[in-house]
């Protein structure tokens, strides 16, 4: 029974005292029994949390009651239980690490497209659909005919822009998981001379909820315990291949060698054969972890105390 929810959200807005707000926000999450990861910066708020339906309802009311977050939109998905083991509420320089700290999405971004508008535009001849996510994300799922960027992290995006100059005459439709990366990516594209830039409001997750995920090939990589999520209920497919043998597989695993910890698709047969390792070298590594068939190795709680960083 899916009586829990996963919330995904972000909001670019000015937070005068991130440390004070972190304290308040952390306490509210503890009160409501939420787990997850929340980042607070002077430029805004970014989070993904899980909790009971009632806990999530009260949390959304709490956040939306703050005038700074009146424009914030929650993406809500039903789940069987918590999608996280811990709660982290942290202050960082940016709400998503981008190497674009000078870009202010509250001043200028690409035009926001609702999922229905994105669906109507994406296949036009004068349009290019641009995936602004990292390799490990788009290798397991992406929109049909999307242009992908060879980058290990979003902070590499500014250096990759020069490879996209040939697209400047097109309408560029950017997308990412929940919309947050597109805020700065689309703004930076405009800064670099791209004139007609759009972004999928709410990202792949909202598109899956509102449009059934049509033409999203493969699975959506998510940053919680699920790792990948089914978003396409219309014409689903598998596009990722096993890192070891090359057969189709959307089963994401971490290499059982913790020193490597490579995150790649691996079919069940290769998982058993390789004992969860991505190579023979990793299979023989003295620190190799026992493989239980999942390829997931949750971090030990090691005396985790959710009140550890609370000052009052």
From Swiss-Prot:
Coiled coil: none
CDD domains per the UniProt record, alphabetical: RHOD_YceA
InterPro entries the record matches: Rhodanese-like_dom, Rhodanese-like_dom_sf, Rhodanese_C, TrhO, TRHO_N
Transmembrane segments: none
Taxonomy, superkingdom: Bacteria
GO BP, one annotated term: tRNA modification
Official protein name in the record: tRNA uridine(34) hydroxylase
Species this chain originates from: Cytophaga hutchinsonii (strain ATCC 33406 / DSM 1761 / CIP 103989 / NBRC 15051 / NCIMB 9469 / D465)
Name of encoding gene: trhO
């Amino acid at each position: 029974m899916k009586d829990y929810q996963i919330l995904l959200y972000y909001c670019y807005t000015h937070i005068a005292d991130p440390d004070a707000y972190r304290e308040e926000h952390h306490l509210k999450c503890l009160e409501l029994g939420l787990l997850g990861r929340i980042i607070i910066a002077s430029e805004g708020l970014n989070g993904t949390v899980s909790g009971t339906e009632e806990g999530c309802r009260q949390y959304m009311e709490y956040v939306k009651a703050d005038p700074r977050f009146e424009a914030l939109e929650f993406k809500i998905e039903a789940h069987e239980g918590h999608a996280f083991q811990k709660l982290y509420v942290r202050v960082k320089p940016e709400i998503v690490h981008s190497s674009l700290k000078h870009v202010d999405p509250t001043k200028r971004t690409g035009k926001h497209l609702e999922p229905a508008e994105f669906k109507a535009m994406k296949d036009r001849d004068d349009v290019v659909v641009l995936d602004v996510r990292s390799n490990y994300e788009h290798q397991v799922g992406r929109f049909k005919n999307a242009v992908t960027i060879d980058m290990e992290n979003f902070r590499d995006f500014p250096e990759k822009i020069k490879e996209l100059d040939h697209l400047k005459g097109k309408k560029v439709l950017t997308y990412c998981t929940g919309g947050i990366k597109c805020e700065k990516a689309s703004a930076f594209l405009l800064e670099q001379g791209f004139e007609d830039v759009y972004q999928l409001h709410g990202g792949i997750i909202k598109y899956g909820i509102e449009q059934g995920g049509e033409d999203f090939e493969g699975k959506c990589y998510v940053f919680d315990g699920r790792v990948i999520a089914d978003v396409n209920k219309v014409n689903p497919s598998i596009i990722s291949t096993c890192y070891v043998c090359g057969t189709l597989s959307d089963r994401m695993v971490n290499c059982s060698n913790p020193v490597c910890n490579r995150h790649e698709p691996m079919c069940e047969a290769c998982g058993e054969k390789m004992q969860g390792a991505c190579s023979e070298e990793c299979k023989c590594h003295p620190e190799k972890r026992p493989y239980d068939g999942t390829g997931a190795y949750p971090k030990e709680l090691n005396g985790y105390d959710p009140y550890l960083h609370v000052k009052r």
